[in-house]
Regions:
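Short, contiguous strand/loop micro-motifs
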Residues: 18-19, 240-241, 286-287
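A short, hydrophobic secondary-structure junction motif
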Residues: 21-23, 76, 123-124, 245-246, ...
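Short, intrinsically disordered terminal tails adjacent to the first/last structured region
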Residues: 322-325
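Short, contiguous pre-domain boundary segments
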Residues: 1-5, 278-289
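Pocket-edge positions in alpha/beta enzyme catalytic cores
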Residues: 44, 73, 242, 288-291
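C-terminal helical subdomain
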Residues: 179, 231-283, 293-297, 301, ...
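Rossmann-fold NAD(P)H-dependent dehydrogenase/reductase core
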Residues: 1-223, 306-318
Length: 325
C-alpha cells in the first residue's frame, strides 16, 4: 500500500533558539532537523557524545546552513541537568522553543537513576522537570513554547504515588505509563502557572503515536538486547503505511504543538489516523488521566520538591536556580 505523504509547513524561525532533548536519533533528530531547516538555532543536549556527533553530521548534511550544536546532558542525573542549565544560562541566549522528547521505555528489570529514582520516572519525568526549572529564566526571556512529548501509554494506568520508584513491585509498562502521565500533568500545569504568573511561556503536549524508533528498538543499556516480533511487525507496518507512522510523521505533532499559533497552551496534539497511532498531526482531546487539575497541582509540587526546583515561579526563582546549580 502506498503511503499518502504527510507534512506540515513551519514558519520562519530565524533568530530563535530551540533546545530538543532526545535528538541523537529517531523522532528527536527529525524534529531538530526540521527546526534547523526553518532557520532556528538548535541545541542538542546529548548523553552519548558519539551518537550526538553522528546526529550533528546528519542534520548538517540535510541542512547545509544549519545552526546546530551539541551540549552534554544526562537526564538521569540531576547534577548533569543542572550543569547544562548553568552552561546555557551563562550563554545568555533566550530559548524560544523547548521540546522535551527524550525518554526510556520499559526496561525489563528495575533500574535507577544516579539520584536513586526508578529510571523511567527519573528520566522521562523528573529530568525534564529539572530542565524546565534550570532554563526557566531563559524560557521567560524567550517567551518560549514548551512541548512535552508524552505517549499513548498515558491513556492507561495511573501515577504510582504509593511507590513512585517502584521499589516494592516493578512492572516496566506500568512504570512507563506512570512516568508519562506525571510528565503530561506537569506540562499542562506549567501552562496554567505561566498564564497565572505572566511568564509568557506556552506549554503544550504531544504524542508521536507508534513508529519504528530507538525507543522500541534493541536497547542494551536498559537490558533490551534482542529484537522482537512486535518490533519487526511495527517496522513492516510503518514501511507499508499500515496503521502506524514513520519517524518523520511521528515528529510532526510536536512540531505542530511548538509552532502553530493556534496551539496557545494546554493543548494536546497527536496523529489523527485510526486509534491515533499514525496519520496527519492534529489537536486531540486530552486523555482523562491528564485532565485532572487537582492531580496536576499535586504532581507540580511533588516534582519541584524531588528535583530541588521549589523556587520555580517565585520572584527569586532565577537566584534560587543559580544557587542550586
Amino acid at each position: 500500500m502506498a503511503r499518502t505523504p504527510i507534512d506540515i509547513t513551519l514558519p520562519d524561525m530565524t533568530g530563535s533558539r530551540a533546545v530538543v532533548t532526545g535528538a541523537s536519533d529517531g523522532i528527536g533528530r527529525h524534529i531538530a532537523t526540521r527546526l534547523a531547516a526553518a532557520g532556528a538555532e538548535v541545541v542538542l543536549p546529548v548523553r552519548n557524545p558519539d551518537k550526538g556527533r553522528t546526529a550533528l553530521a546528519a542534520i548538517e548534511a540535510a541542512v547545509p546552513d544549519a545552526q546546530v550544536s551539541l551540549r552534554t546532558m544526562d537526564l538521569s542525573s540531576l547534577e548533569s541537568v543542572a550543569a547544562l542549565g548553568a552552561t546555557l544560562r551563562a550563554e545568555g541566549v533566550p530559548v524560544g522553543i523547548l521540546i522535551l522528547n527524550a525518554g526510556v521505555m520499559t526496561p525489563p528489570e528495575r533500574q535507577t537513576t544516579v539520584d536513586g529514582h526508578e529510571l523511567q520516572f527519573g528520566t522521562n519525568h523528573l529530568g525534564h522537570v529539572a530542565l524546565v526549572g534550570q532554563l526557566h529564566p531563559l524560557l521567560v526571556a524567550g517567551r518560549a513554547r514548551v512541548v512535552s512529548q508524552v505517549s499513548v501509554a498515558a491513556n492507561q494506568g495511573a501515577v504510582h504515588y504509593e511507590d513512585l520508584d517502584w521499589e516494592r513491585s516493578y512492572d516496566g509498562m506500568k512504570a512507563y505509563s506512570s512516568s508519562k502521565i506525571a510528565f503530561g500533568l506537569f506540562g499542562l500545569e506549567l501552562d496554567r502557572r505561566s498564564k497565572a504568573a505572566g511568564w509568557g511561556i506556552t506549554s503544550n503536549l504531544s504524542h508521536p503515536g507508534i513508529a519504528p524508533t530507538a525507543l522500541l528498538a534493541a536497547r542494551p543499556e536498559v537490558g533490551r538486547s534482542r529484537d522482537t516480533l512486535g518490533r519487526r511487525l511495527i517496522r513492516v507496518m510503518s514501511a507499508r503505511g499500515i496503521l502506524v507512522g514513520t519517524v518523520e510523521t511521528a515528529g510532526l505533532p510536536a512540531l505542530l504543538a511548538a509552532t502553530d499559533p493556534a496551539a496557545d497552551g494546554g493543548r494536546f496534539f497527536g496523529p489523527s489516523g485510526p486509534r491515533n497511532l499514525g496519520g496527519a498531526p492534529a489537536e486531540q482531546p486530552l486523555y482523562g488521566r491528564l485532565a485532572d487539575r487537582e492531580q496536576a497541582a499535586r504532581i507540580w509540587d511533588l516534582s519541584l520538591r524531588l528535583t530541588g526546583m521549589t523556587g520555580l515561579g517565585t520572584p527569586a526563582a532565577g537566584r534560587d536556580i543559580e544557587a542550586a546549580s
